[in-house]
Regions:
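Sec-dependent signal peptide recognition
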Residues: 2-9
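Residue-level signal for mature regions of secreted extracellular proteins and peptides
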Residues: 11-12, 247
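C-terminal motif of bacterial Sec signal peptides marking the signal peptidase cleavage site
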Residues: 15-17
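Bacterial signal peptide processing site
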Residues: 19-22
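Hydrophobic/aromatic hotspots within intrinsically disordered, low-complexity regions
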Residues: 24, 28-31
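Glycan-processing catalytic domains of CAZymes
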Residues: 31-271
Length: 271
């Protein structure tokens, strides 16, 4: 799920209460404190601020503890600059879809490429059962992420079994793949988030380090995400302006997410 123009809206920190006059502009305060999980890996804690930008001119003025950026499009020099500013960097990678514009798109044989995902042009679902083909490609992506200096990985599209992918994917097959997605990141010393797939949180909680969920307030499943926040793990709730006004966000989402210790962000989504 990429090729979007993401626009951070004001607000996000639970500790800040999403207060003030929000606008679709940078300005999220940061919080001290990702705690080390191991000597080589860190884990974001509940309430930390995050800037997510996958496209467009990168804005490093946003005061956020963590930056989530496109892995292919972000240069190592940008990651170094973020580190010099005392920030962490997480790389976005789609592990469940084929994206025709990626430099390694030609490495995916036709046998693993399925239906269009229905939302984004040039993006198709992958047959995650064909691990002998997919794992080396994804490992190479992770290695590039690590080489660029990123601290973690944001693997998207890990719930294909819930969509019309063109393949008869089962929940069990998805679970197996998702566990590999997390384990492979850890093997490289990278932290990793669970992006959506809330139905498998209980099975994945001990594999992933934190959570990122799209529209949990609109969809009505934010409470499920407390499995992470109860362990003091960061959970980001992304709500979109195409279904959420700024006023409703401030008056409804912010207090609700504060109750669950989630970090809410309002974004503008454009193709």
């Amino acid at each position: 799920m990429v090729r979007l123009t993401y626009c951070i809206a004001a607000l996000s920190l639970v500790l800040a209460g999403c207060g003030g006059s929000a606008s679709v502009a940078p300005g999220v305060p940061s919080v001290a404190g990702s705690v080390p999980l191991t000597s080589s890996r860190w884990i974001p804690t509940a309430g930390e601020s995050i800037q997510i930008q996958y496209d467009g001119k990168l804005d490093l003025s946003v005061d956020a503890a963590i930056y989530d950026l496109d892995m292919f499009d972000t240069k190592a020099s940008v990651v170094r600059e973020l580190h010099n500013m005392g920030r962490k960097a997480v790389c976005y990678i789609s592990v469940g879809t084929w994206e025709k514009w990626r430099p390694d798109a030609g490495k995916f044989p036709k046998s693993v490429i399925g239906n269009k995902d229905g939302h984004w042009a040039g993006e198709r679902w992958l047959d995650i059962r064909q691990t002998a083909i997919l794992e080396p490609i994804m490992t190479a992506r992770y290695q590039l992420c690590k080489k660029k200096g990123f601290d973690g990985v944001d693997p998207d599209n890990i719930a294909g079994y819930q969509s019309k992918t063109g393949f008869p994917l089962t929940a069990a097959e998805q679970l197996t793949y998702n566990k590999w997605v997390a384990t492979e990141a850890h093997d490289l010393g990278l932290t990793v988030d669970q992006k959506n797939d809330n139905n498998q949180i209980k099975d994945l909680l001990n594999y992933f380090d934190f959570g990122v969920d799209e529209q949990c307030f609109v969809q009505g499943w934010c409470k499920q995400l407390t499995a992470y926040t109860n362990k003091n793990r960061l959970v980001v709730d992304i709500e979109y302006t195409n279904q959420m006004t700024r006023t409703r966000f401030l008056n409804k989402v912010c207090p609700s997410d504060a109750n669950y210790k989630l970090t809410p962000i309002l974004k503008k989504l454009e193709l």
